[in-house]
Amino acid sequence: MFRQLRLTMDISGWIFMPWRRSLSNKQSPPPPLASTINDVIVDYDDPDYLPLPEYPVRPNEPLDIRKQRLLYQSRKRGMLENDLLLSTFAAKYLDNFNAEQTAQYDQLINGVSNDWDIYYWATDVKPTPKEYDTEIMRLLKDHVKNAERISRIRQPDLYSSES
């Protein structure tokens, strides 16, 4: 019995040792690194300073594969506002797009480097640049106005439950 008690105490001491050590070391935090003291503010308005990678064009991609990719990309934007707007837009319109409309939608959601730009253009907060002011953008703006007053608090299901 004493051997088991001693073993239990040894194990508990081993488990709680880092916790005890952290309580006993009440030292001040280390000084900041020298490289962080003289940080430089980067001006991102200069396009030559920070080149953004261009989205690869996929000319030989089959239309059905492109639509599947765009449906996924419409749902997984990384910001909830665009996830909701673009996923509901894609669920409503993407299946009926022809090849040219699909290419315009691809350029819209993948050609822009900042998702907030898409959001501001679609909600008419900022004017849409000429190269993105297409039939698809006008359709997206109408979709965002939500004249039908459809609830869009969640993304639509990928597949309807009827099938």
Curated annotation (Swiss-Prot):
Main location: mitochondrion
Name of the molecule in the record: Succinate dehydrogenase assembly factor 2-B, mitochondrial
Keywords (A to Z) from UniProt: Chaperone, Mitochondrion, Transit peptide
Protein family membership: Belongs to the SDHAF2 family.
Name of one Pfam family that matches: Sdh5
Record keyword Mitochondrion present: yes
Gene Ontology terms describing biological process: copper ion homeostasis; mitochondrial electron transport, succinate to ubiquinone; mitochondrial respiratory chain complex II assembly; protein-FAD linkage; tricarboxylic acid cycle
Keyword Mitochondrion (UniProt): yes
Assembly, per entry: Interacts with the flavoprotein subunit within the SDH catalytic dimer.
Membrane-spanning parts: none
Transit peptide: 1-23
Source organism superkingdom: Eukaryota
Subcellular location: Mitochondrion matrix
GO cellular component, as recorded: mitochondrial matrix; mitochondrion
Matches recorded under InterPro entries: SDH (IPR005631), SDH_sf (IPR036714), SDHAF2 (IPR028882)
Purpose of the protein: Plays an essential role in the assembly of succinate dehydrogenase (SDH), an enzyme complex (also referred to as respiratory complex II) that is a component of both the tricarboxylic acid (TCA) cycle and the mitochondrial electron transport chain, and which couples the oxidation of succinate to fumarate with the reduction of ubiquinone (coenzyme Q) to ubiquinol. Required for flavinylation (covalent attachment of FAD) of the flavoprotein subunit of the SDH catalytic dimer.
